[in-house]
Amino acid sequence: MSHTMGKNNREAKEKKGQPEPLSGSHKVKNRNHSRQKHHAHHDM
């Protein structure tokens, strides 16, 4: 029973932790993309 609980806890933590970092990475990527696009426009 302890093994199942540990596995369940680990899966729940991984599932909950996956969407959080993905969202953060997306936000940073989006910001970087916007900045790079602006820079390219300026160069032009």
UniProtKB/Swiss-Prot annotation:
Specify the superkingdom: Bacteria
The entry's keywords:
Sporulation
Leader sequence residues:
none
Record InterPro entries: SASP_SspP (IPR012614)
Give the principal location in a single coarse category.
other
| Localization terms from the record | Spore core
Task: Please state, per the UniProt record, what induces or represses the expression of this protein.
Answer: Expressed only in the forespore compartment of sporulating cells.
Q: Where is the composition biased (Basic residues)?
A: 26-44
Query: Which residues fall in a compositionally biased region of kind Basic and acidic residues?
Result: 8-18
A Pfam family annotated for this UniProt entry = SspP
Please cite one Gene Ontology biological process associated with this protein: sporulation resulting in formation of a cellular spore
Region described as Disordered:
1-44
The record's comment on protein family reads:
Belongs to the SspP family.
Instruction: Report what the protein is called.
Output: Small, acid-soluble spore protein P
Source organism (scientific name) = Bacillus cereus (strain ATCC 14579 / DSM 31 / CCUG 7414 / JCM 2152 / NBRC 15305 / NCIMB 9373 / NCTC 2599 / NRRL B-3711)
